[in-house]
Amino acid sequence: MMTVFISCRTLHSGMQKPAPLPAFDKEGHRGARGLMPENTIPGMLKAIDMDLTTLEMDLQITADRQVILSHDNHINPAFTLTGEGKEISEEDAKKRTFYKMNFDQVKSFDVGTKFYDKYPKQQKLKVHIPLLSEVIDSVQTYLAVTGKPQVFYNIETKSSAAGDNLYHPEPNVFIKLVMDVVEGKKITPWTIIQSFDVRTLQVLHDKYPHVRSSFLVEQGSLKDNLQTLGFTPSIYSPAAKLVTAGLVKEVQAKGMKIIPWTVNEKQEIDRLEALGVDGIITDYPDLFNQ
């Protein structure tokens, strides 16, 4: 039965047309960061268990050109231990840049055992920084086994002009490495590429126009931000503090979805839903059920 489910999804993903987005998109930030180690396979599966419709994640590139999940461009000592369970100093952690390490080295770190005081509700377990391909395989298999509906992948390219060839490759290479995995795993119809870096979104729009894009913004007006980007993305993803009734109407009038980040209070979720947003990104998926 599992083979049947997977083969059906593989067949359908060959059609490059994007799948319809959920009526209201419930997104788990870095999986389910408030409840599980961030950007890990267990975190993504937890989000699925909680009936989220989209898995949000961050990407970095290793020295051997592997696509991995991590928000930071180097080891984060706040929640990372060596494979032997030893602490890592901040000074040492900053030297351990992923773009200068091969994946075999990256995989040796434990990002799930150490208590993370910012997220005290996190379940603790020994887990490694995964490849994007590992995450996709695990998610697709889990969906097949559990019978849960197909989820979307909201994938952020963590890049900036200042970091080119220092912390990550240039945008055209970054996007190609990511899309090689996405297309190879045949999840293109359920993929959204998001970024604060307009350059990666511009490359995506030029070379992969069939793939949905999401423009992350933290400040500025809609008009100015879209002018900087140079095209109209599928999704406009502002910081929650920027969202007003007027912005929601303006974004939707241009044919975009509006999905704010990162909303970790039930009262704020209720406010945004009342304004008519198309989805919400949160660290705490359990808030949707309260």
Identify what each model region corresponds to.
Residues 6-290:
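Phosphate-group recognition and catalysis centered on beta-loop-alpha active-site segments
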Residues 1-5:
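Bacterial N-terminal signal peptides
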